[in-house]
């Protein structure tokens, strides 16, 4: 019996042997590969390596042949042949199909660059978290500015707006607005029937000054960051299109924009909110531009300093709301360190944003760790990869007690501690995979996208379960009183007893 017959399953082999059927044609012959064997995955891996090697050899042969033909035709082009060695390196830890995809993209990019006489640019790791991300808002605005006429208003405005990192600024402003809305004001939807001063409510004007001032402070910090490191930005794929790298703006214009936004933002917070919030806004600029940015070249501790910067905006929102209902002199001690513990909610929100920076940034930096290293920026992703995963896991676990703390301090209902648990568990699970696999096999991508969705979901859950909000909504809709109160009546008493002076008691007015 032939070897091809021996490779078939036992039942089919016995049938073919006993029936003595004539040999099957090539179109009818069953192959052993039709039946999935236990060695399927090893064969796929081996085939992937073989295909990659074959594609590299074919690329080398094709480019060499093309170069030889050009030389024979007397071409004057000085373009060097594109070989596998000339292509950007591809991470060997990727899955086979990812590796082949990266090789094809690298070959196509190298061929296009060679045709245009340019130097091939390194490709982003296709397994990195940033592989599926669209260009950020700064890059899009810089591209729009570059396409506009040199002296046009569109070019100048787009370039200046690009300095502010719009998406990051929006996140900063939202992280200040949520604690402002969640501050436990005594009356959220209704005002006091007796004296509105006894039941303070959130002021739309204060919220306007808070958002405007925070936006300007964030824009100032981001512009100063770009002013400090245009040389390192030019070495990284995700930052090489920034306006100062592309010389869309002069350094003088960027300095004026940064200083102007910083002054306007702190003044708006000082006069429109309170001095404590203004100080926090100025401190945020100083820490981000004066400490975090220079530390990136010195130590991986820069990540912790950057996380502190991320935790300040929630404190700003909380202090802004606390200033409206302050019963004392409204100093920073009362707003941030109240003796009755009412400021704990603000610090818990600051802790949430501080902890969130690590499961978000660690997988993001892992995908471009080689670029960080080439640019001279010290990140745990390449200085200590094992610790990089441990840090992401450690701060992912911190979300569980922080969410419970918000319920325990009366900021949210206890249902928030329950509903936030599945979201926090999802983040922890992705962080465990990122730690165990050290970023490989898609674990970095999984944790990055989990962190992207995690924070807004937690914020929405907290807003939807603010302490006492739904009870007040119910009473406001159905007209039920907030508490049982006695009727206000007048009782006449003798002048000898009451002296003719009206005396107010709870539920009763004596006259």
Swiss-Prot record:
Biased composition regions of type Low complexity, renumbered to the chain: 52-79, 104-115, 126-136
Protein location: Mitochondrion membrane
Annotated transit peptide: 1-23
PROSITE patterns linked to this entry: UBIA
GO biological process: heme A biosynthetic process
Record family assignment: Belongs to the UbiA prenyltransferase family.
Protein name listed in UniProt: Protoheme IX farnesyltransferase, mitochondrial
Gene behind the chain: pft-1
């Amino acid at each position: 019996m032939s070897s091809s017959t021996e490779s078939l399953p036992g039942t089919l082999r016995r049938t073919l042997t006993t029936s003595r059927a004539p040999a099957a044609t090539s179109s009818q012959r069953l192959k052993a590969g039709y039946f999935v064997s236990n060695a399927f995955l090893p064969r796929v891996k081996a085939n992937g390596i073989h295909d990659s090697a074959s594609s590299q050899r074919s690329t080398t042969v094709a480019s060499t042949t093309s170069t030889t033909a050009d030389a024979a035709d007397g071409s004057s082009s000085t373009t060097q042949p594109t070989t596998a060695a000339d292509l950007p390196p591809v991470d060997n830890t990727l899955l086979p199909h990812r590796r082949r995809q990266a090789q094809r993209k690298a070959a196509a990019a190298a061929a296009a660059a060679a045709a245009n006489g340019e130097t091939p640019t390194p490709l982003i790791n296709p397994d990195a978290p940033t592989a599926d991300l669209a260009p950020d808002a700064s890059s899009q605005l810089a591209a729009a500015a570059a396409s506009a006429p040199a002296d046009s208003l569109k070019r100048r405005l787009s370039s200046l707006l690009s300095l502010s990192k719009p998406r990051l600024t929006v996140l900063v402003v939202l992280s200040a607005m949520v604690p402002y809305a969640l501050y436990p004001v005594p009356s959220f939807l209704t005002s006091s029937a007796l004296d509105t001063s006894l039941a303070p409510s959130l002021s739309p004007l204060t919220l306007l000054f808070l958002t405007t001032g925070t936006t300007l402070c964030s824009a100032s910090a981001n512009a100063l960051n770009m002013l400090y490191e245009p040389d390192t930005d030019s070495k990284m794929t995700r930052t090489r299109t920034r306006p100062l790298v592309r010389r869309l703006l002069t350094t003088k214009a960027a300095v004026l924009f940064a200083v102007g936004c910083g002054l306007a933002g702190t003044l708006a917070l000082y006069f429109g909110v309170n001095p404590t919030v203004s100080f926090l806004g100025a401190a945020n600029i100083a820490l981000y531009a004066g400490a975090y940015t220079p530390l990136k070249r010195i130590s991986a501790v820069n990540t912790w300093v950057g996380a502190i910067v991320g935790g300040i905006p929630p404190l700003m929102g909380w202090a802004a709301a606390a200033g409206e209902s302050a019963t004392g002199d409204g100093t920073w001690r009362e707003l941030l360190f109240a003796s009755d513990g009412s400021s704990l909610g603000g610090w818990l929100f600051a802790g949430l944003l501080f902890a969130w920076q690590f499961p978000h940034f660690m997988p993001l930096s892992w995908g471009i760790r080689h670029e960080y290293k080439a640019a001279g920026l010290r990140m745990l992703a390449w200085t200590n990869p094992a610790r990089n995963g441990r840090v992401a896991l450690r701060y992912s676990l911190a979300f569980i007690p922080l969410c419970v703390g918000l319920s325990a301090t009366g900021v949210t209902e206890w249902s928030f501690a329950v509903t936030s648990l599945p979201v926090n568990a999802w983040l922890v699970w992705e962080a465990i995979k990122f730690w165990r696999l050290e970023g490989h096999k898609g674990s970095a991508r999984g944790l990055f996208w989990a962190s992207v969705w995690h924070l807004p979901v937690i914020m929405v859950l907290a807003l939807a379960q603010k302490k006492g909000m739904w009870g007040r909504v119910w009473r406001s809709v159905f007209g039920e009183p907030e508490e049982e109160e006695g009727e206000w009546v007048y009782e006449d008493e003798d002048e000898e007893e009451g002296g003719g002076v009206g005396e107010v008691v709870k539920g009763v007015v004596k006259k």
